[in-house]
Amino acid sequence: MEDKTVELQFITHFTDTYSYYDSARMALEGGCRWIQLRMKDTPVDEVEREAIRLQGLCKDYGATFIIDDHVELVKKIHADGVHLGKKDMPVAEARGILGKEFIIGGTANTFDDVKMHYKAGADYIGCGPFRFTTTKKDLSPVLGLEGYRSIILQMKEANIHLPIVAIGGITLEDIPSIMETGITGIALSGTILRAKDPVAETKR
């Protein structure tokens, strides 16, 4: 399967300091070229308004624009793709709606999750959490480096080739050791937004 991911993915997160738009803009200014709009528990019309703004911003930077959860919205506005969490629509159902031209990512916490998404036609996996994180409710069991090594090894044994993006409580210092496990990329949110200079943090 063609690798449609990039090494750094940024997931928007609303804070007291930054709006969704501002957080995405700073990540893009810092060199990130993959933005995922994540607005859980928000009315779909609000998500659509924000998505259209961010889609234009991503086009200006030549970045990939992914929307979390909202499959029909992705199709409606022609975003680049959708990311589906464990409680969202199944990947196979989303693929049936979107067809082959859209990117579909799925969340995984175990090798069985990865295998299921692979068979369903996912383009990449968001795998985590690496450690405890406050940016997500209903957290799955923490994986750590050993969890990633185990999943990557089982994928090799099963001849499954799929980009795996690590997510969940990752700091800048964690990235070299995570990448050594065979992980394809890193997804960040809070680490960038908590920095004194989010643009500089993204560049680092």
Where does each model-flagged region fall?
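Contiguous, function-dense segments enriched for cysteine-driven chemistry
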Residues: 143, 190-191
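Flexible, gly/pro- and Lys/Arg-enriched active-site loops
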Residues: 84-92, 132-155
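C-terminal binding/interaction regions
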Residues: 181, 185
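Glycine-rich beta-strand-to-loop/alpha-helix junction loops that act as flexible
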Residues: 127, 165-170, 186-190
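Histidine/lysine/aspartate-rich catalytic loop segments that bind and position anionic ligands
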Residues: 111-141
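Conserved N-terminal beta1-alpha1 strand-loop-helix module at the mouth
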Residues: 1-89, 96-111, 115-123, 150-153, ...
